[in-house]
């Protein structure tokens, strides 16, 4: 284990043990994206950035620690723009969540014009499983760059030809992301 990870390990243990429910969760059920005629999992949660942008987050029942956000969203990219087309809860019943629960004044499908970021689409076989967030590593990752809802870039990374981060590195990365998400939820509730 590299020196900096040895120093961070006790901190990570303390954070994991003291962090409430969402950040101590398991690998997550991903959102879905219809892209080029194929429905694929995305290891990104674009809707969370909408809530982080001062819009109140409705209550979504959490049916599982594998779905800390309480919903699974289905997206599509059509004519270079990203749209939210469907939401369902994470309970055993997988009930449909009306998009109007979040977007009262927008037509469906909802154009994701609030989202700027990167969508990660895993491809190929899993090289390393990480039991947290979206930390697992696959043979390839397709990264789609979105700016204000518009697809502006696409890049494939071949993980078989690059150094695969250690499980500790992936876990620290996922813990950091989950902690940021949790902090944003708390801030929006205040």
Locations of regions flagged by a protein language model:
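Bacterial N-terminal signal peptides that target proteins for export
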Residues: 1-9
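Bacterial N-terminal signal peptides
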Residues: 8-20
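Intrinsically disordered, low-complexity acidic regions enriched in Pro/Ser/Thr
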Residues: 20-190
């Amino acid at each position: 284990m590299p020196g900096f990870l040895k120093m961070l390990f006790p901190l990570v243990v303390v954070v994991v043990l003291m962090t409430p429910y969402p950040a101590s969760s398991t690998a997550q059920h991903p959102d879905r994206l219809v892209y080029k005629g194929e429905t694929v999992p995305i290891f990104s949660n674009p809707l969370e950035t909408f809530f982080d942008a001062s819009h109140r987050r409705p209550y979504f029942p959490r049916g599982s620690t594998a779905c800390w956000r309480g919903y699974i969203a289905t997206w599509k990219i059509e004519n270079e723009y990203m749209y939210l087309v469907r939401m369902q809860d994470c309970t055993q019943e997988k009930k449909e969540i009306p998009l109007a629960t979040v977007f009262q004044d927008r037509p469906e499908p909802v154009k994701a014009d609030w989202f700027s970021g990167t969508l990660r689409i895993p491809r190929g076989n899993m090289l390393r499983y990480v039991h947290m967030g979206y930390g697992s590593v696959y043979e390839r990752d397709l990264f789609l760059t979105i700016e204000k809802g518009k697809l502006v870039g696409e890049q494939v990374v071949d993980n078989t030809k690059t150094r695969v981060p250690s499980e500790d590195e992936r876990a620290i990365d996922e813990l950091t992301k989950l902690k940021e998400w949790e902090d944003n939820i708390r801030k929006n509730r205040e």
